[in-house]
Amino acid sequence: TLTNESILLEYYMDVLGNESAEALDLAFLNSFYHSGVRNPIDNALLACQTMPGREAHFGELLAQYRKTDEIPFDYARKVVSTLVTAADGSSKLILKGDVAHVVARCGTVAYRGQVLPMEEDTAQSVSAVVSEMLQDGMKVIAVAQKEMGTADHITSADEQNLTLVGY
């Protein structure tokens, strides 16, 4: 929501509009670790770490993952990717940005603990959820992820066949 030239995080949700802590966590990690210019959306996401009762959670999240690599935002791609690595050495690519550009890079969706193929009816459901939010005047960004094994570097070729997590 745009208020007094600042953006407030109103919702963080899965692909069908249900509240999703996973979508928030991934978007937060992406915003925290990317080194490009911070925009009002990044600032709104980063403000979550000071939410009452959530400070410890975001502190633990940052302790669990470290940044390994990134592909900065650019206006052609309309997304930013970060590669984070957990203490066990496993890496994941987190992609955040314009809904259409994120969805176009996804082959699957995460929903209620399952990873499902991005089929035509799924894509239509995603579009309907996003359209409703846009009609309500919201700025919507999407977040997706991809397990990367023990990778320590990413390229734009890695930004394909991701799993859409939410908005």
Give the positions of each predicted feature.
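Conserved cytosolic headpiece of P-type ATPases
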Residues: 1-167
